[in-house]
Amino acid sequence: MIPVVALVGRPNVGKSTLFNRLTRTRDALVADFPGLTRDRKYGRAFLSGYEFIVVDTGGIDGTEEGIETKMAEQSLAAIEEADVVLFMTDARAGLTAADLSIAQHLRSREKTTFVVANKVDGIDADSACAEFWSLGLGEVYQMAASQGRGVTNMIEYALTPYAEAMGIERQGEEEVVDERQYTEEEAEAEQKRLQDLPIKLAIIGKPNVGKSTLTNRILGEERVVVYDEPGTTRDSIYIPMEREGREYVIIDTAGVRRRSKVHQVIEKFSVIKTLKAVEDANVVLLIIDAREGVAEQDLGLLGFALNAGRALVIAVNKWDGIDQGIKDRVKSELDRRLGFIDFARIHFISALHGTGVGHLFESIEEAYDSATRRVSTSMLTRIMQMSQDDHQPPLVNGRRVKLKYAHAGGYNPPIVVIHGNQVSRLPDSYKRYMMNYFRRSLKVVGTPIQLRFQEGDNPFENKTEKLTMSQERRRKRALSHIKDRKTK
C-alpha cells in the first residue's frame, strides 16, 4: 500500500511550499483534463523512486485553549492515518509555543515523526536548528523547501522502511512500467492470463452518496455487517466476491461503520483512505448523488482517479424518485462538467432498490479489459501509420515530422510510446488527434490513454565525420590539384 506523508506545523512555516514542490511533477497529468482543478491539500508525489500521498494538514495555532480544539477534524484524521509525519518548523523564527504544543500532541500519538527545520537558506543553520532538539522528537533535519535543498534527502530517509515493499531499485525518477514489446501471440496469451485475475474495484464518493448501500447491494443483503474490527479506522476493507464466474475484490472505503439503529448505518469519510484505495485498485467506481449534482468534492475525487491513471466508471445514485425536470438538469450538468472524460461510462442507478446496479459490472469489466489489454508492437505501429495516412503530421521548419514506430509503454492506464524525428515539436492538437485515433482503433473504453513521444537517436550526433579510403584519396587529389594551381 502506498505510504502517506502528512505535513504538520503552525502557519507560514513552508508546508504549502513543500507540498507544491513534492506534487508538481503530477500537475501535467491533471492539466490534461481541462475543467478539472487539482486539490490543494492532498496530492500524489513521486520523488527519487518513492511514490507516496502527501497531505498538507493546514496551520495549527497551538494556543492555550488546547491544540485539539484548534485543529480541524480532517487535519487530526490526516495525522492519525499518516504513515509518516513531517513536523515543519521555521528555523528563522526559532522555537515557539505553538511548536511545543504540536510536539506534545505528536508525542502522545506515537507517530513516526521527523522534525524539519525549514528556511535554513542564508543563515547559520546549525546554530538556528539547535534549539529544536529540545522538542524530544529526535534528529532535526535542515531544509530550504523554496529552493528544494534537503527535500530529496529528507524523503529518502523518511521512506526508507518502505523501499523494499515499493521495489526501489530504479534509477532517476521514471516509473517502472511494463514496456515489453509483445508479439501477437504473446499479447493474446498475456491478456488471457489477466482475465483470470480478480478485478480490484474501489467504490469511492463523498459522504452519504450511498457507497455503503451500493456495497451491500452488490454483496447481498446477508452481508450487511458492522465493520469495527481493529485496523479498519485506517485501512479500507478488502472483500472478495465472485459474479458470473469472474472474481472481484471490492475495496470498501466507506470507513468505520456503527449501527445507531437496526437498519441505519453511519459512515466515516476519509480522504486518505480513499486515495490509498484508488492507488491499489484496477477500476474506480465513482458515486455521484443525483440530488446534489456534480459537486467540487466529486471533481476532486475524479482528479485523484485520473491522476493515478485508473480505469473509471461513474454511477449517478438516487436516480429513482426525482422528477424528469431534475433528471434533465443533472444530465445537462454532467455533459457540461464531465465532458472532458468522454471515455468513461455513466450509469444512472438506485443502490437502495437495485435499479441499474447489474449493468455496472458490464462497464467495470469493459474498463478493466481496456486498461490491461496487451497490444503487440506491430499492431500499434500499424495504427500509428494509419493515423498518418489519414492526417499527415505538420511541417516544422519546412520538414515533415516523421513517426517511425510505436510500442506499449505501460498498462492501467495504457501507454503508447511513439518514436520519431522532431516529435517534440508536434502541436498538442495533433497529439490529441493521435490519442483519439488510438482510442477508437483499439476500442479503449473506461480508461484514459496516454501517448509518450521519444526522439530517434541520431547516430552521427557528436561524432566527427570519418571518410572512406576512396573519399580520402579523392580529397588528397583535390588538395594536390589546388596546391599545383597556386604554385603556377
From Swiss-Prot:
CDD domains attached to this UniProt entry: EngA1, EngA2
Region called Disordered, residue ranges: 469-488
Domain EngA-type G: residue ranges: 3-166, 199-372
Annotated KH-like domain residues: 373-457
SUPFAM superfamilies: P-loop containing nucleoside triphosphate hydrolases (SSF52540)
Annotated positions binding GTP 2: 205-212, 252-256, 317-320
InterPro entries reported for this sequence: G_ENGA, GTP-bd, GTPase_Der, KH_dom-like, KH_dom-like_a/b, P-loop_NTPase, Small_GTP-bd
Compositional bias annotation for Basic residues: 473-488
UniProt entry tagged with the keyword Cell inner membrane: no
Keywords: GTP-binding, Nucleotide-binding, Repeat, Ribosome biogenesis
UniProt-annotated binding residues for GTP 1: 9-16, 56-60, 118-121
One Pfam entry name: MMR_HSR1
Stored Gene3D superfamilies: 3.30.300.20, P-loop containing nucleotide triphosphate hydrolases
Superkingdom per UniProt: Bacteria
GO molecular function per UniProt: GTP binding; ribosome binding
Sequence intervals crossing the membrane: none
GO biological process, one term: ribosome biogenesis
Coiled-coil regions listed: none
UniProt similarity note: Belongs to the TRAFAC class TrmE-Era-EngA-EngB-Septin-like GTPase superfamily. EngA (Der) GTPase family.
Function summary: GTPase that plays an essential role in the late steps of ribosome biogenesis.
Quaternary structure, from the entry: Associates with the 50S ribosomal subunit.
Entry protein name: GTPase Der
Species the sequence originates in: Shewanella putrefaciens (strain CN-32 / ATCC BAA-453)
Highest classification ranks of the organism: Bacteria, Pseudomonadati, Pseudomonadota, Gammaproteobacteria, Alteromonadales
Gene name linked to the record: der
